[in-house]
Amino acid sequence: MKALLVGDLSPTAKSNPLFAAKDIDGLFSKDAKKLFEGNDINFVNLEVALTDIENGIKKFGPCLKASGGTADVLKSLGVTVCGLSNNHIFDFGRQGVADTLSHLERVGLPYTGYGKNYEDSRKNYFVEKNGERVCLIAVCEHEYSYAEGDFEGSRPFDCYDTLEDIRSAKEEADCVIVLYHGGKEHCRYPSPRLVKTCRAMVKAGADLVLCQHTHIIGCYEQFGGGHILYGQGNFHFAGHSDKDGESWNQFLATLYDTETHEIEFLPMVNDGPKIKLAEGEEKEKILKGLRERSALGEEGWYEGFKNACHTDFAWYVKAIGYEGASEHDFHLLAHYLDCEAHHDILSELFKTAHQKKENY
């Protein structure tokens, strides 16, 4: 089968009126629309609640919502399945999700990566054609939206359950594609943990792992017979902010042949509230950057990740909770984060609003 897999879609203040008006031509260039033709699978990560609710949940970060017309646009565009495993689908609580699912069901658009409880969220999504079976697994890191126990939410990545889910899927399908929503935002390089995680998923049976969420194009590697893209960039987050630089406005559409396992990355760019395929020098510049970063390998990726972390040092120091923290305090915090048992204790003592079920 032929699959088109694209990243995060979230209408912005500039593009939402066009989504509400179902103005496909105002949102997608001709070449962008053509990408969706002739494929068996067209996947997009719907990173927004389609709702009119005013008040978002208690969280750090923005609450994203958009017009229900977004569902109509995606259906008309040719999207065949939406991924809902991300950190914004629950921004307006259960009612916001209910509204979103209602709009998707209204236009007949399937979704994956969300469930009425944790076990339900783990349902795999299969596509069958001419005797071939492909499985899509959409998972996210733990950031406000995830399912837990009997509570609804996105399908979270779990270092035990997800790998088992991939192994089970491989027994039932010819090809397994994992959409992993995670990684450090605005960083082109994967952390050592993310590299290990993605490689483990390939070892478990994934043929392709696409990391989304970071809003920026990262690095690529072939590993163990599989493909891993550490950072696909957005899909339609056009006009998010006038301050957004070049990195935010460039992204990759992924074309993948599930039988031959051939893969192609197609650079795309924002053009006001519209997106289009990159051409000429701009296209080559994007691909050249991807090749150069990918060639750095693990050591180079770690240096890039480490440098990005240090630029955010002051931000994370705030989490300690007081000014004048000493070197001893930093070492103590590092010890608590490093040791599994201490990490368990911290997680039990200090819970987010999501974990406390305050957003339900």
Language-model features, listed with the residues they occupy:
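Conserved beta-sheet core of the metallophosphoesterase superfamily
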Residues: 78-81, 192-251
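A short C-terminal boundary segment appended to hydrolase-like catalytic domains
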Residues: 17, 246-360
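Binuclear metal-dependent hydrolase catalytic cores centered on His/Asp/Glu-rich metal-binding motifs
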Residues: 14-30, 64-65, 124, 128-176, ...
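Active-site environment of divalent metal-dependent phosphoester hydrolases
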Residues: 12-14, 50-53, 87-101, 118-123, ...
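Active-site-proximal segments of metal-dependent phosphoesterases and phosphodiesterases across multiple
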Residues: 53-75, 175-207
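N-terminal catalytic scaffold of extracellular/periplasmic and nuclease hydrolases
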Residues: 1-85, 93
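Active-site neighborhood of phospho(di)ester-bond hydrolases with catalytic His/Asp-centered motifs
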Residues: 5-7, 42-47, 77-87, 110-115, ...
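Short acidic, glycine-rich surface-loop motifs adjacent to enzyme active sites
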Residues: 39-51, 166-189
